[in-house]
Amino acid sequence: MAVETIQKPETTTKRKIAPRYRVLLHNDDFNPMEYVVMVLMQTVPSLTQPQAVDIMMEAHTNGTGLVITCDIEPAEFYCEQLKSHGLEQQH
């Protein structure tokens, strides 16, 4: 009886990296700056007050500010929370 070893062809499995989503804050002429900072800190618990102030000032100065970059589910949650507090892009 003969024994033969069959070699399995090498395959590499590459995991796709989940895309990251940016939550942006748009400047508006309606909400007071202090309110925007408070809402940012309530919505994104990892933000400190200086970070929230920086985001608000970036939006105020440049038109938009980057709130956070994250996976889609938290990004959608943060976006909805900000909108529910009146922080949404006005047309």
From Swiss-Prot:
Enumerate the Gene Ontology biological process terms: protein catabolic process; proteolysis
For this protein, the parts annotated as crossing the membrane are none
Q: Which SUPFAM superfamilies match?
A: ClpS-like
Gene3D superfamilies, per the entry: 3.30.1390.10
Q: Disulphide bridges in this chain?
A: none
Pfam families recorded: ClpS
Subunit annotation: Binds to the N-terminal domain of the chaperone ClpA.
Biological role stated in the UniProt entry: Involved in the modulation of the specificity of the ClpAP-mediated ATP-dependent protein degradation.
HAMAP family named in the record: ClpS (MF_00302)
The record's similarity note reads: Belongs to the ClpS family.
Q: What is this protein called?
A: ATP-dependent Clp protease adapter protein ClpS
Query: Which organism is the protein's source?
Result: Synechococcus sp. (strain ATCC 27144 / PCC 6301 / SAUG 1402/1) (Anacystis nidulans)
Which lineage ranks, top first, belong to the organism behind this chain?
A: Bacteria, Bacillati, Cyanobacteriota, Cyanophyceae, Synechococcales
